[in-house]
Amino acid sequence: MYQLRHKKFVATDLETCWDFFSSPSNLKKITPSYMGFHVKNEIPEKMYEGLMIEYTVTPLLNIPMNWITEITKIDYLSYFVDEQRKGPYKIWHHEHHFKKVEGGVEMEDILSYVLPLGFLGNIAHALFVKSKVREIFEFRNKKVEEIFK
């Protein structure tokens, strides 16, 4: 299993930060356009445990992939977890943590994932998946800074 941990300071209050990140409609705003992110089902303004979000993405070679994510756990103003139910990964478990700190919010993402195809998945991870995942987080960092200026 691979794991990526990423911390980010956001210069806003905890409630504003939580409201932005817990609204599924904002995911597209912090996803690179080349990913072709498109939500396929109706989504509420605010997430809830058990919420299923179906979307397509084109992360590699412009090949569309269907992905279904479930919001499996929410602790209001503290963290939420999304897990892939259908998609390109064998396992995808993404924790989003929020902590009030002086001057704003410290966000921490903890992403744990496993690729399919055994050793071929490990090769793909080394060749491009790891760098692509990091690139997406770097893009999100920049967008979050723009949004919360």
Task: Tell where the protein language model's regions lie, with residue ranges.
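Hydrophobic ligand-binding cavity/cleft-lining segments
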Residues: M1-Y48
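Short, surface-exposed coil-to-beta transition loops
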Residues: Q3-R5, P64-I68, I91-H94
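Generic structural detector for well-ordered beta-strands
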Residues: R5-A11, H38, T56, E70, ...
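Beta-strand elements of well-folded, non-transmembrane domains
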Residues: V10-T12, V57-L61, K73, P88, ...
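A short, structured loop/turn motif at beta-sheet edges
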Residues: D13-L14, K46, T72-Y79, H97-E106
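Hydrophobic pocket/interface hotspot
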Residues: T16-F21, L27, I53-Y55, I71, ...
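Glycine-rich portal/gate segments that line the openings of hydrophobic small-molecule binding cavities
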Residues: V39-K86, F139-I147
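Beta-strand/loop substructures that line and gate deep hydrophobic ligand-binding cavities in soluble
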Residues: Q84-E135
